[in-house]
Amino acid sequence: SPYTLEEVVARNYLINEHPDVILNIVDGTNLERNLYLTTQLTELGIPVVMAINMMDIVKKNDDKINVKELSRELGVTIVEISALKGNGIMDAAEAALQAAKVGRTIPMHTFSGAVEHAIAHIEEAVLHDMPEDQQRWYAIKIFERDDKVLAKLNLSKEVLAHIEKDIQAAEKELDDDAESIITNERYIYIASIIKGCYKKKTAGKLSTSDKIDKVVTN
């Protein structure tokens, strides 16, 4: 869920304006941190193209990103770029145009059984009149009890009470609150992807992003 003003504005634009395609630029030297947003973007029903930036530095460090496998795991087209050197920019733009023609991105990630049961029930009970490609994102946000989404949908007390039973059942089974369940399961999913797709030669060495963060926060 977004908390900063910038995140709220960006999310509202994507949901309300429903652009033809999302070009998701991620830092290849700190891939794991960036994938959390990517998993959310793929649930919006909008085609997603990932541009992995700083690939020149990734290769210089002799790290390995299995782009083909990463693309398969996430269900998105991936292009390697170096914004600083201007490499791959046109390829990313062309990939975005092609993705817009093809249509929606199908999210590859599924949550645990209890969560998926609740999400399916929410889609059926609340979101059946909404465009199909937007239903999953809204259902996940309802499951998380996202205040802004609930305010926008303005659901009746009866409907809220109905779906709350499934949410509470998932919370009881997984022994956590709904928002934390979604967050934790995303991170577990991302960790499994990184394990299979990202090999870091310089284990223990700080990435460029981490170095910047360290300077800024000290």
Tell me what each language-model feature is.
Residues S1:
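Conserved nucleotide-sensing/catalytic segment adjacent to the nucleotide-binding pocket
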Residues L5-V79:
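Conserved C-terminal guanine-recognition region of P-loop GTPase G domains, centered on the G4
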Residues V8, I188, L206-D210:
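Alpha-helical membrane and juxtamembrane elements of multi-pass inner-membrane transport
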Residues V49, K59-A203:
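Alpha-helical transmembrane helix bundles of large polytopic membrane transport and channel proteins
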